[in-house]
Amino acid sequence: MKVKIEESWKEVLNNEFNKEYFKKLVKFIKHEYKTKNGKIFPPPKLIFNAFNSLPFKDIKVVIIGQDPYHGKNQANGLAFSVDSKIKIPPSLQNIFKEIEKSLKIKTIPNGDLKRWAIQGVFLINTILTVEEGKPSSHKAIGWEIFTDEVIKIISKNLKNIVFMLWGNLARSKKGLIDPTKHLILETSHPSPYSANNGFLGSNHFSSALDYLKKHNKNIINFQ
């Protein structure tokens, strides 16, 4: 089936788009957008924003989130990201805090992470849609099957990618990644409830830049 997505992704995911589970997923999601009167996030055109912001072969870092923010006007299709006019959520505040400490730089007070995506950071949630005010409302409808396959395809077809796995859900994806080809960084989720259990002080961002330099890749400006 036809999916509006960046051409290089269309090529690597075409088989997935034609599987029965994905067809059922699309049918369900279309019905949700049609019947829930603007209460499904992100807007339809932004569901695949992570893919459309970054060609497949340009990926350098993968950050795995959970499901989109469920507040109005927050989710923009990039994990942990919000539109520039929206207040920066607590988890992203902690991400910026860790960047400033780890890299000794000042971050831009802007929650739109498109600036990272265009440099090679693939910001993928395990679930790509959500109903307003209902976290995990689109769990187990097919998105996890799809995003697991995306992670496996990245691991198999690319090399020397940094995978940042924050929190139990993201860390459960470790088995999908080939540790002989990639750098896997694990710690707690940046949420205020768990950031002090390892995320703050993890130095993931400095480790990522060191790894990219080691493998002769252009480093990322995480400001």
From Swiss-Prot:
InterPro entries: UDG_fam1, Ura-DNA_Glyclase_AS, Uracil-DNA_glycosylase-like, Uracil-DNA_glycosylase-like_sf. One of its GO terms (cellular component) is cytoplasm. SMART domains: UDG, UreE_C. The keyword Nucleus does not apply. GO terms for molecular function: uracil DNA N-glycosylase activity. Its EC number is 3.2.2.27. The keyword Hydrolase applies. Keywords: Cytoplasm, DNA damage, DNA repair, Hydrolase. It catalyses: Hydrolyzes single-stranded DNA or mismatched double-stranded DNA and polynucleotides, releasing free uracil. It is an enzyme of class 3 (hydrolase). It is found in: Cytoplasm. GO terms for biological process: base-excision repair, AP site formation via deaminated base removal. The active site is at D67 (proton acceptor). Belongs to the uracil-DNA glycosylase (UDG) superfamily. UNG family. Excises uracil residues from the DNA which can arise as a result of misincorporation of dUMP residues by DNA polymerase or due to deamination of cytosine. This is Uracil-DNA glycosylase. It comes from Borreliella burgdorferi (strain ATCC 35210 / DSM 4680 / CIP 102532 / B31) (Borrelia burgdorferi). The gene is ung.
